[in-house]
Amino acid sequence: MSSVKRNPKKEMISELHSSAAEGNVAKLAGILSHSPSLLNETSENGWTALMYAARNGHPDVVQFLLEKGCDRSLVNKARQTALDIAAFWGYRHIANLLANAKGGKKPWFLTNEVDECENYFSRTLLDRRSDKRNNSDWLQAKESHPTTVYLLFSDLNPLVTLGGNKESSQQPEVRLCQLNYPDVKGYLAQPEKITLVFLGVELEMRKGSPAQAGGVPEEEEDGLVAWFALGIEPGAAEEFKQRHENCYFLHPPMPALLQLKEKEAGVVAQARSVLAWHSRYKFCPTCGSATKIEEGGYKRVCVRETCPSLQGVHNTSYPRVDPVVIMQVIHPDGTKCLLGRQKRFPPGMFTCLAGFIEPGETIEDAVRREVEEESGVKVGHVQYVSCQPWPMPSSLMIGCLAVAVSTEIKVDKNEIEDARWFTREQVVDVLTKGKQQAFFVPPSRAIAHQLIKHWVGMNPNL
């Protein structure tokens, strides 16, 4: 008779898995102290010790294995994670334990470093020069300076004109109308009917400044070209359009604002967000009295002398920014991504999930909460990628990659209409062939598009 050749490693793995299934923590500890490399080893069906513990309802074993650093994102041959298994068999305590575990091994398909990138709305032509906002004499002098640039807004929509070139997207090139003091002198004479915001000065000094030709004394010339955003009333805007037939106010904001040149878009993002704040905070949030504009449009001050907001520094006096997490959720095995859609989206459009950060919440926890609320999918590891100002009216989109630790989708219809897992091949086809496919994603100037592209790019061998 021929003897059966033993496989000591296979026997050790089998013993490890049996101990996990039986809930024997002491035996597990002994095996792993001798052979720690067996922690994430799988059986023939792709199951790990963590999966066996989850299947048989042993929270103490699950906790022990998590503390040892086991990889909870691994999937078996049935495409299930340990969390999927625990949820299926009704072990809620274990499912919560797996979903909320901190740290752990970083998924293999995430890169260690993310290259810094500039998204649309984040580039600009200007240096904001916040040091000039308190200098009322300087601001007043710049208002009538011949080189000063004014951007006109009506209902938060910028005044633009069509350029002579065509962009690759076949959309006509849209450019901001850069007005000068004579164009807006009449509006500036009626400060109660306008909103004026100092945006900054041009990053590049102009050569051959026409300042002296405009009557500016040489000793008062500093060479700085100031830009202002000027919000006017709808009636005045209509009258202006009638006198300038080549100009119009860009509307609706989405997707119209995506037609701007990149550096001009950054200026509009700044201007639109501050103007939106002014339109919403005409009265003091503390006492309800009227407010007045100061610091070049970057502060509103209550006119009531006894208002508590005048004592110390209060965030209600300054423009607000609303932080939003937007995340590319990646399947535990790294081969798929989760995209969703809202009812208001164009038919066929899917994008990254997103949501506002709540008070007292970290970016990572906001990502996990929003993904679970909208799709029912639980997320483990979260990695920051890049951010994008989003002037709708004043959000900051914080882009992240998020690795799922469960795969079952349970859409909350009050949050979104649909959510699905898409393969890398499907996403690549959409990025290269656009709307010829069964679904499409936001345009390249949206951070969602860049997050999706980032995920595709970091998996070149899949």
UniProtKB/Swiss-Prot annotation:
Q: Which residues bind Zn(2+)?
A: C284, C287, C302, C307
Positions where N6-succinyllysine occurs in the chain: K10, K185, K292
Q: What does this protein do?
A: mRNA decapping enzyme that specifically removes the nicotinamide adenine dinucleotide (NAD) cap from a subset of mRNAs by hydrolyzing the diphosphate linkage to produce nicotinamide mononucleotide (NMN) and 5' monophosphate mRNA. The NAD-cap is present at the 5'-end of some RNAs; in contrast to the canonical N7 methylguanosine (m7G) cap, the NAD cap promotes mRNA decay. Preferentially acts on NAD-capped transcripts in response to nutrient stress. Also acts on free nicotinamide adenine dinucleotide molecules: hydrolyzes NAD(H) into NMN(H) and AMP, and NADPH into NMNH and 2',5'-ADP.
Q: Where are the ANK repeats?
A: 11-40, 45-74, 78-98
Record-linked Pfam families? Ank_2, NUDIX, NUDIX-like, Zn_ribbon_NUD
Tissue specificity: Expressed abundantly in the liver and kidney.
The residues that the entry says bind Mg(2+) 3 are: E370, E374, E415
For biological process, the GO terms are: circadian regulation of gene expression; mRNA catabolic process; mRNA methylguanosine-cap decapping; NAD catabolic process; NAD-cap decapping; NADP catabolic process
* Residue positions binding Mg(2+) 1: A354, E374, E415
Q: Indicate the segments forming the Nudix hydrolase domain, all copies.
A: 319-453
The cofactor note from the UniProt entry for this protein is: Binds 3 Mg(2+) ions per subunit. Binds 1 zinc ion per subunit.
What species was this sequence derived from?
A: Mus musculus
Q: Which NCBIfam families match?
A: PRK00241.1
**GO cellular component labels:** cytoplasm; nucleus; peroxisome
Q: Sorted alphabetically, which InterPro entries does this protein's record hold? A: Ankyrin_rpt (IPR002110), Ankyrin_rpt-contain_sf (IPR036770), NAD-cap_RNA_hydrolase_NudC (IPR050241), NADH_PPase-like_N (IPR015375), NudC-like_C (IPR049734), NUDIX_hydrolase-like_dom_sf (IPR015797), NUDIX_hydrolase_CS (IPR020084), NUDIX_hydrolase_dom (IPR000086)
Gene giving rise to this polypeptide: Nudt12
Q: Which cysteines share a disulfide bond?
A: none
Residue ranges annotated as motif Microbody targeting signal? 460-462
Query: Under the GO molecular function aspect, what terms does this record hold?
Result: magnesium ion binding; NAD+ diphosphatase activity; NADH pyrophosphatase activity; NADPH pyrophosphatase activity; phosphodiesterase decapping endonuclease activity; RNA NAD-cap (NMN-forming) hydrolase activity; zinc ion binding
**UniProt keyword terms in alphabetical order:** ANK repeat, Cytoplasm, Hydrolase, Magnesium, Metal-binding, NAD, NADP, Peroxisome, Repeat, Zinc
Q: Which family does it belong to?
A: Belongs to the Nudix hydrolase family. NudC subfamily.
Q: What is the protein's given name?
A: NAD-capped RNA hydrolase NUDT12
